[in-house]
């Protein structure tokens, strides 16, 4: 079949476009990043991310309340621990910054969906994503550590 004119009936008006679209994006489809700093009280702007803040454990629920008010129903938490070491042990500390943030959020907002970042770069004193062996990340040792995080 050779078409000299492409049919555009599904694009002819706003109503039909809304009815036939394949993708819908709404606030409840979004995941909001929340940066939680164990050493912080209150919240502090992140210069490199305009409009974003680091929250202390005392204000993490405020961030979630703002999400819910905007229709966002989930977040991903990024932790900034007080203690950093070569293997990132604060990442699996039962009283770590993310573990405490999850408890606070779930106590107030049990239906709010919380995702956590399991990268260990923020927890290591060298900034790499796992335990080092010489100048390289030791993947096997790091995988063992990661099992402790989740």
Residue ranges, per PLM feature:
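N-terminal amphipathic/basic leader segments beginning at the initiator methionine
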Residues: 1-21
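Glycine-rich tight-turn/loop motif centered on a GG-T
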Residues: 2-5, 45-54, 83-98, 126-144
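Positively charged, small/polar-rich N-terminal and surface patches that mediate targeting and assembly
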Residues: 24-25, 73, 95, 112
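N-terminal small/glycine-rich loop or linker at the start of catalytic domains
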Residues: 25-52, 115-138
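Short beta-strand segments at enzyme active-site cores
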Residues: 34, 72-80, 111-119
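Active-site cofactor/substrate anionic-group-binding motifs, chiefly glycine-
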Residues: 42-74, 78, 90-93, 98-102
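Alpha-helix-loop-beta-strand connector modules within alpha/beta enzyme cores
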Residues: 87-118
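Conserved small/polar residues in nucleotide/adenosyl-binding loops
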Residues: 149-150
């Amino acid at each position: 079949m050779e078409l000299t004119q492409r049919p555009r009936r599904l694009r002819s008006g706003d109503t039909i476009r809304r009815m036939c679209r394949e993708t819908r994006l709404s606030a409840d489809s979004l995941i909001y990043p929340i940066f939680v700093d164990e050493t912080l009280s209150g919240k502090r702007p992140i210069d490199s991310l305009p409009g974003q803040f680091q929250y202390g454990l005392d204000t993490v629920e405020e961030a979630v309340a703002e999400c819910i008010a905007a229709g966002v129903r989930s977040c991903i938490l990024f932790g900034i621990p007080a203690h950093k070491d070569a293997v990132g042990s604060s990442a699996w500390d039962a009283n770590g910054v993310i573990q405490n943030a999850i408890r606070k959020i779930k106590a107030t907002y049990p239906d709010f969906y919380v995702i956590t970042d399991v990268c260990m770069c923020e927890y290591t004193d060298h900034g790499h994503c796992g335990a080092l062996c010489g100048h390289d990340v030791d993947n096997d040792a790091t995988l063992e550590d990661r099992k402790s995080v989740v």
